[in-house]
Curated annotation (Swiss-Prot):
Sequence segments annotated as region (G2): 372-376
InterPro entries per record: EF-G-like_DII, EFTu-like_2, IF2_II, IF2_N, P-loop_NTPase, Small_GTP-bd, T_Tr_GTP-bd_dom, TF_IF2_bacterial-like
Residues annotated as domain tr-type G: 338-508
Keywords assigned by UniProt, alphabetized: Cytoplasm, GTP-binding, Initiation factor, Nucleotide-binding, Protein biosynthesis
Cellular compartment(s): Cytoplasm
Protein name stated in the entry: Translation initiation factor IF-2
Annotated stretches, region: G3: 394-397
Record GO terms (molecular function): GTP binding; GTPase activity; guanosine tetraphosphate binding; translation initiation factor activity
Xref: HAMAP family: IF_2_B (MF_00100_B)
Chain segments carrying region G1: 347-354
Length: 839
C-alpha cells in the first residue's frame, strides 16, 4: 500500500494519544502511567469491520485447506488398509475339507476383535495425520500472520506520521509518548489483542510468537533510543508531551514574606530569604542604578530598598548575639555614687582654650604645641581649692578636627565654650554650639581675652543670642563668665560655675564593678606598642583587667595618668593611658571590661569581619557610582595620598579634610592611612599607587627611606595641619586642566589690496588699535562678522619685513591660505593666554 493510498484512507479525525507515560527515573526505578486510547467511534467501527472481514477470509481459507488435507489423509489410510488385508490373505493356512463348515462361526468370532483393532489403528493414524496437517498449516500460516502484523504496524506508523505532520502544520501540539519498559510494552500488546478480539494462538506457535515479540521489543527499544537522541538534539518536530513535564501549577501571584536582614547580606542569601531567583534581585538593582553579582555583599540599607521594592516587609536586625552574651556577663549592679563632671573646652582656633586650661592645671601645654594650636584631644583631671575634682577634655579648634570635637562633646557632661572678646562668634564657635546641643550637654560660656583694650563682652552676648545661647542676664540659663587666661582673671568664677552646673545635673556612676568607658585618643608608641587614652565612665578599671575595645582587645599591662605616673586603678571620670591592647583602637570606640579573654577575642574578630563586609559593600557601591559618573563626565584626575600620623584622631581629621578638598576635576584619594611611623610597607604601597606620602608628626624608618630614595617617592613631613592642607591644595592645582583665554592685541583696517607673485593678495592696512605682531593668530572681519580665522603670514612696512607694527602706522599684511581680502575688512590680531587656576 503506497503512502498516497494510506493518506487517502486517513480518517478526518484521528487522535494518536494512544500511550502516555510519565517516567520518573531515580536509579533503576521506572514508573509507567497508561492512558486509554482516544479514537473516534466511526473510525474504530470501520477498522473493526475491516479486521473482521480479513479474519473471516483467513478462517475460510484455513478450513478449506484443512478439508483438502483431511480428504487426502483419508484416501491414504484406506489404501493402507486394503494393502494390509491383501497381505493377510496371502499368508492364510490351507483349509481342511472336513472342517470347512465348522470354521465360519469360529473364524467369525476370532475375526471380530482383530477388525476392531484395525479400525482403532486407522483412527489413530487419521488423528495423527490431521494433527500433523494442522501443524504444517500453522507453520505455513505463522509467517504470513507475522508479515500481516508487520504490514499493519507499518501502515499504522505511516498514518501516525501523516497525522503528526498535519497536526504540526495546523499549529497544534503533538504529544510524543514512548515506553521504555519491556513489561509495559508487553502489557500494552495484550490489551490491544483483547480489545481487537484476536484469537489465541496455538501452542505450537507460542514460542515463535514470543521470539518475534522479543525481536519487536528489541527493534522498538532501538527506535526509542534513536527518537530520544532526535528529541535531545531538537530534531523531532513534535513538542515534548505535557505528561513528561513537572506536574505542579505555577503560583498565580508572588508570595510576600517578612525578610530579616542583618548588617550585611549577599544577593544570593537575600534571594533565598525572599523565595525568588537571584536574577530578579539583580534586575531590580539594575533598575535602581546598581550593578551587582550573585555573590556580592550588599549593605543593610540597599537590601532594605530592594526587598521593599519587591513588596516584602523588612525586619532589620543587628547580628550581635555574641556581643550581647559577653556584655550580659558583667557585674554592674553596684550602688551608684556621685562622680566628678567631665568638662570639654571648645571654641574657635586661637581663642585661648589651651591657655585657659594651662592656667587651671598650672602647666604650660600651649607653649609646646606646634604652631601654637592644639591638634590632639587632651584629657586631664584637676582638683579645685575646695577639694572637688573636675576632668577636662581639650579639643582642637581647627576646622579639620570636627570629628574630635563631636567625640569630645559626646563623652562630656558640661561644655565650656571659649569665645574671644575681641573676635566674637566665629565659624568653629557655631560648630561647637551645634555639637553641644547634639550631645545634650549644658553650656558655660567663658568670654576670654577681656584684658585687651578692644574687648567687648557684651557684643559676644548679643551675637550668641541668634544661636539660642541666652545668658542669665537676658533671662536664659547659660552662665557667662569673663576671664583672662593670660592674667588669670575670672578663673575661680569659671570653676565655681562648672561645679554649680554639675550639682544641678546630679551626676552619678557605679564605682565598684567592671569598668566601661570611651576611647578619647589612641596612638602607636614605638617602644610601648598600642596606647589608648580611655575615659572611665562607670566602674573601676584595674591593672590586669581584660578590655574589649572596638576591633581590639587585650589585658591591661600598665596604666598611666596624664602626667605619666603609673597607677593601678582608675574610677569614674578619670582619664588613663592603657597599654596592652592587640592594636590601635579607633578614637570614640567603647571600652568594656569582660571576664573571658577568649570570648573578647571572638567578639573582636567578629566585629572585624563584619566591618570588612560593610566596607567592601560600600566600596563596591562607590566604585559603581564612580563608574557611572565617569561614563557621563569623562575621566577625573586623581591625587593618591598615604597618610601616617602620631594619633588616631589626627589620621581621621586629615583624611576627612583631604576628602573635602576634592573637586569635580581633581579627586583626592587616600589609598592608605595609619598610626605610627612610616614603614617600608607604606613606601612600597606609595610606589605601587604613585601616591604622595604625608607624615604628620611622624618620620620614616631606615628601610622606608631606602625605598623612598630608590623609587623617587614624594614624601612630606608636617606638624601643622593647615600647612599640610595648603600644600595638598597646591598639588591639586597643578593637576587641574589649564584654562586658556584669547586676548585681542591689535586691530588693522584694510585700505587697499596689492597682488604679490609669492604671497598672493596683500592687504594694505592702517593699524587702528594696539599692536600687530607677525605669526600671531588673526581673524578677518567683514561688517563685524568673522569670515576667516587663520594666521598672519607676512608683515611689511614699505619693503621691509618687520616683527610688529604699532598703532597709527601703515603696513602690508599677508594672510596665510586666504586671498579673499577686500577693502573695508578688518584684521583682528589676538594671542592665547594661559590662566592659572586654583582650588
Amino acid at each position: 500500500m503506497s503512502d498516497n493510498e494510506i493518506k487517502n484512507e486517513t480518517p478526518k479525525k484521528l487522535s494518536l494519544q494512544r500511550r502516555t507515560k510519565t517516567t520518573i527515573a531515580d536509579g533503576k526505578v521506572q514508573v509507567e502511567v497508561r492512558k486509554s486510547r482516544k479514537i473516534d467511534t466511526a473510525v474504530a467501527k470501520a477498522e473493526q469491520a475491516k479486521l473482521k472481514a480479513k479474519q473471516e477470509a483467513e478462517a475460510k481459507a484455513q478450513e478449506k485447506q484443512a478439508a483438502e488435507k483431511a480428504a487426502q489423509a483419508q484416501t491414504e489410510a484406506k489404501a493402507q488398509t486394503e494393502q494390509a488385508c491383501t497381505t493377510k490373505k496371502t499368508i492364510q493356512p490351507p483349509i481342511i475339507p472336513g472342517k470347512q463348515k465348522a470354521m465360519p462361526k469360529t473364524e467369525a468370532k476370532k475375526a471380530t476383535p482383530k477388525t476392531e483393532k484395525i479400525v482403532d489403528a486407522e483412527k489413530e493414524a487419521k488423528r495423527k495425520e490431521e494433527a500433523e496437517l494442522r501443524r504444517k498449516q500453522e507453520e505455513l500460516a505463522s509467517p504470513k500472520a507475522e508479515m500481516e502484523a508487520k504490514r499493519a504496524a507499518e501502515n499504522a506508523r505511516r498514518l501516525a506520521e501523516i497525522a503528526r505532520e498535519e497536526t504540526v502544520e495546523n499549529g497544534e501540539e503533538f504529544e510524543d509518548n514512548r515506553f521504555t519498559s519491556t513489561y509495559a510494552r508487553e502489557a500494552d500488546r495484550d490489551h490491544d489483542r483483547r480489545s481487537e478480539g484476536n484469537r489465541t494462538r496455538a501452542k505450537g506457535g507460542v514460542a515463535k510468537a514470543k521470539k518475534g515479540g522479543r525481536e519487536d521489543d528489541k527493534n522498538e527499544r532501538n527506535s526509542d533510543r534513536r527518537n530520544a537522541k532526535d528529541i535531545k538534539g531538537k530534531k523531532s518536530k513534535g513538542k515534548k508531551g505535557a505528561s513528561l513535564q513537572q506536574a505542579f501549577t505555577k503560583p498565580v501571584q508572588a508570595v510576600k514574606t517578612d525578610v530579616v536582614i542583618g548588617e550585611t547580606i549577599t544577593v544570593a542569601e537575600l534571594a533565598n530569604k525572599m523565595a525568588i531567583k537571584a536574577t530578579e534581585i539583580i534586575k531590580t538593582m539594575m533598575k535602581m542604578g546598581e550593578m551587582v553579582t550573585i555573590n556580592q555583599v550588599i549593605d543593610q540599607e540597599t537590601a532594605q530598598l530592594v526587598a521593599e521594592e519587591l513588596g516584602h516587609k523588612v525586619i532589620l536586625r543587628k547580628e550581635n548575639e555574641l556581643e550581647e552574651s559577653v556584655m550580659e556577663d558583667r557585674d554592674i549592679d553596684a550602688e551608684k555614687v556621685t562622680r566628678a563632671p567631665v568638662v570639654t573646652i571648645m571654641g574657635h582656633v586661637d581663642h585661648g582654650k589651651t591657655l585657659l586650661l594651662d592656667y587651671i592645671r598650672k602647666a604650660k601645654v600651649a607653649a609646646g604645641e606646634a604652631g601654637g594650636i592644639t591638634q590632639h584631644i587632651g584629657a586631664y583631671h584637676v582638683e579645685t581649692e575646695d577639694g572637688k575634682m573636675i576632668t577636662f577634655l581639650d579639643t582642637p579648634g581647627h576646622a579639620a578636627f570636627t570629628s574630635m570635637r563631636a567625640r569630645g562633646a559626646k563623652a562630656t557632661d558640661i561644655v565650656v565654650l571659649v569665645v574671644a572678646a575681641d573676635d566674637g562668634v566665629m565659624p568653629q564657635t557655631i560648630e561647637a554650639i551645634q555639637h553641644a546641643k547634639a550631645a545634650g550637654a549644658p553650656l558655660v560660656v567663658a568670654v576670654n581675652k577681656i584684658d585687651k583694650p578692644e574687648a567687648d563682652p557684651s557684643r559676644v552676648e548679643q551675637e550668641l543670642l541668634q544661636y539660642e545661647v541666652v545668658s542669665e542676664k537676658f533671662g536664659g540659663d547659660v552662665q557667662f563668665v569673663a576671664v583672662s587666661a593670660k592674667k588669670g582673671m575670672g578663673i575661680d568664677e569659671l570653676l565655681e560655675a562648672i561645679i554649680l552646673q554639675s550639682e544641678v545635673l546630679e551626676l552619678t556612676a557605679v564605682k565598684k564593678g567592671m569598668a566601661s568607658g570611651v576611647v578619647i585618643e589612641s596612638y602607636l608608641d614605638k617602644g610601648r606598642g598600642p596606647v589608648a587614652t580611655i575615659l572611665v565612665q562607670s566602674g573601676t578599671l584595674n591593672k590586669g583587667d581584660i578590655v574589649l575595645c572596638g576591633f581590639e582587645y587585650g589585658r591591661v599591662r600598665a596604666m598611666r595618668d596624664e602626667n605619666g605616673k603609673d597607677i593601678n586603678s582608675a574610677g569614674p571620670s578619670i582619664p588613663v593611658e592603657v597599654l596592652g591592647l592587640s592594636g590601635v583602637p579607633s578614637a570614640g570606640d567603647e571600652a568594656t571590661v569582660v571576664r573571658d579573654e577568649k570570648k573578647a577575642r571572638e567578639v573582636a574578630l567578629y566585629r572585624q569581619g563584619k566591618y570588612r563586609e560593610v566596607k567592601l559593600a560600600r566600596q563596591q557601591k562607590a566604585k559603581l557610582e564612580n563608574m557611572f559618573s565617569n561614563m557621563t563626565e569623562g575621566d577625573i584626575a586623581e591625587l593618591n595620598v598615604i597618610v601616617k600620623a602620631d594619633v588616631q584622631g589626627s589620621v581621621e581629621a586629615i583624611c576627612q579634610a583631604l576628602g573635602e578638598l576634592s573637586t569635580e576635576e581633581v579627586k583626592v584619594k587616600v589609598v592608605g592611612s595609619g598610626v605610627g611611623g612610616i614603614t617600608e610597607t607604606d613606601a612600597t604601597l606609595a610606589a605601587a599607587s604613585n601616591a604622595i606620602m604625608v607624615g604628620f608628626n611622624v618620620r620614616a624608618d631606615a628601610s622606608a627611606r631606602r625605598v623612598i630614595e630608590n623609587e623617587n617617592i614624594d614624601l612630606r613631613y608636617y606638624s601643622i595641619i593647615y600647612e599640610l592642607l595648603n600644600e595638598i591644595k597646591a598639588a591639586m592645582t597643578g593637576m587641574l586642566q589649564p584654562e586658556f583665554k584669547q586676548e585681542i592685541i591689535g586691530l588693522a583696517e584694510v585700505r587697499n589690496i596689492f597682488r604679490h607673485p609669492k604671497f598672493g593678495a596683500i592687504a594694505g592696512c592702517m593699524v587702528t588699535e594696539g599692536i600687530i605682531k607677525r605669526n600671531n593668530p588673526i581673524r578677518v572681519l567683514r561688517d563685524n562678522v568673522v569670515i576667516f580665522e587663520g594666521e598672519l603670514d607676512s608683515l611689511r612696512r614699505f619693503k621691509d619685513d618687520v616683527a610688529e607694527v604699532r598703532n597709527g602706522m601703515e603696513c602690508g599684511i599677508g594672510v596665510k591660505n586666504y586671498n579673499d581680502v577686500k577693502v573695508g575688512d578688518q584684521i583682528e590680531v589676538f594671542e592665547v593666554v594661559e590662566i592659572k587656576r586654583s582650588i
